[in-house]
Amino acid sequence: MSEAAGLCIRGLRVVFDGFVAVDGVDLDVAPGDLRFLIGPNGAGKTTLVDAVTGLVKATGSARFGEQELLGRDVHRIARLGVGRTFQTAALFEELTVLQNLDIAAGAGRSPWTMLRRRGAVPDDVAQALETIGLTDRRDVPAGTLAHGQKQWLEIGMLLVQNARLLLLDEPVAGMSHEEREATGELLGKVASDRTVVVIEHDMDFLRRFARTVTVLHAGKVLSEGTVAQVQADPKVQEVYLGHATGEPVAQEVEA
């Protein structure tokens, strides 16, 4: 495992046909952080992640460790250790859990080599299976997994790729309470030696597991800090309640 590196964003700006979607964002996510990114619809959360992962053009700077990410294509950014999930898990559903992990870990190997049944499971794949809690499901088709298990498998696929910066888009959407708790515990383990950023709207989940929170509004950073600090921020209250109340924001924040 490579040493964890932090994400440093400075003056990030994304413009679509004259519309400023991300407006000069500065953001620091330290190694080992489990950062939650929240904000109303149109706040710029997903667009910011799109810029970091090379899906949209942006100006400014986004550095992961010593590497500048802006201006690189998606595949080069991935090879620098940046991994991403979307709201719908991207799996090979007809293949087994083990085969999905094998393919994810198999850059540079032929498809036949990746799909053949072997006597021993590689150490990195075995470790990922244990981390995501799917060791006993390794030989079942990924399409038969429960919703939460599919999300865990996708995270496992990033782990075997040695992703050191994980950008996760609403990982607990549609999960049961038990799945959400297990996912929160999984993210805590993953973040122990990686940098993890979670786009989320579920405030109960955020309260339970976020280490730090960044609130975006209209493409800018509105507030940042612990969950308690963000909820008590008058600026956040103004955006979500229409006025500052002096009481913490308790309602669910839309993604």
Which ranges hold each PLM region?
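Glycine-rich phosphate-binding loops of nucleotide-dependent enzymes
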Residues: 2-255
